[in-house]
């Protein structure tokens, strides 16, 4: 009878070098993940900074366009104005002809009576759409009655559309003034646009014409 001899060999214990190589691999992977996350975070911060800068620039362009519309309205009301479309005779003391509820059209474009006491102002009530540039719009585009021009367009760093304004005639409540001779007050509200029309700025002034 033959007997088979089995020799059992004990497993060799791992050497310190093997453990170190495994630890180094894990450490490298962790560092790689950390560096990747830092890179993604830096990219996002850079993108947000770029968007913030662009928004600030576009808002500034819209604000400057709105201020330009206020100045255009002042020329419309006070002059000097040599445009064939000028309407300086409308803005005389005591005259409210052409000013209507909801703002006028034609020669009276953008001329508005103030809202009733306790009601929302005309410029805030939603009855006036400053973004409407159609033929039925009730706001005045820059240069309409003054002949002045402003560069606009969808390309370049400039307003996409012309700024627009309305003019409300409002009572002067200054005590002691004669009702028949006191100066007329006009409240001008203007909206300007940035390189994208969705970027908007609204400014307002009250103008007293002596």
Residue ranges and their predicted role:
Residues 2-11, 19-28, 32-33, 38-210:
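Terminal alpha-helical segments
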């Amino acid at each position: 009878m033959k007997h088979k001899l089995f020799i059992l060999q004990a497993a060799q214990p791992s050497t310190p070098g093997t453990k170190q190589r495994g630890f180094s691999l894990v450490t490298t992977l962790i560092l790689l993940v950390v560096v990747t996350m830092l890179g993604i975070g830096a990219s996002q911060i850079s993108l947000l900074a770029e968007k913030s800068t662009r928004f600030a620039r576009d808002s500034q362009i819209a604000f400057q366009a709105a201020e330009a519309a206020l100045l255009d309205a002042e020329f419309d009301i006070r002059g000097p104005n040599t445009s064939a479309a000028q309407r300086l005779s409308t803005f005389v003391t005591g005259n409210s002809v052409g000013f209507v509820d909801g703002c006028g059209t034609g020669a009276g474009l953008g001329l508005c009576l103030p809202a009733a006491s306790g009601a929302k102002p005309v410029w805030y009530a939603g009855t006036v759409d400053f973004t409407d540039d159609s033929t039925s719009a009730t706001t005045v585009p820059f240069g309409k009655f003054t002949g002045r021009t402003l560069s606009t367009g969808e390309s370049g760093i400039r307003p996409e559309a012309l700024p627009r304004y309305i003019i409300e005639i409002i009572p002067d409540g200054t005590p002691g003034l004669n009702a028949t001779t006191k100066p007329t007050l006009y409240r001008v509200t203007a909206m300007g646009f940035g390189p994208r029309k969705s970027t908007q700025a609204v400014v307002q002034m009250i103008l007293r014409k002596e």
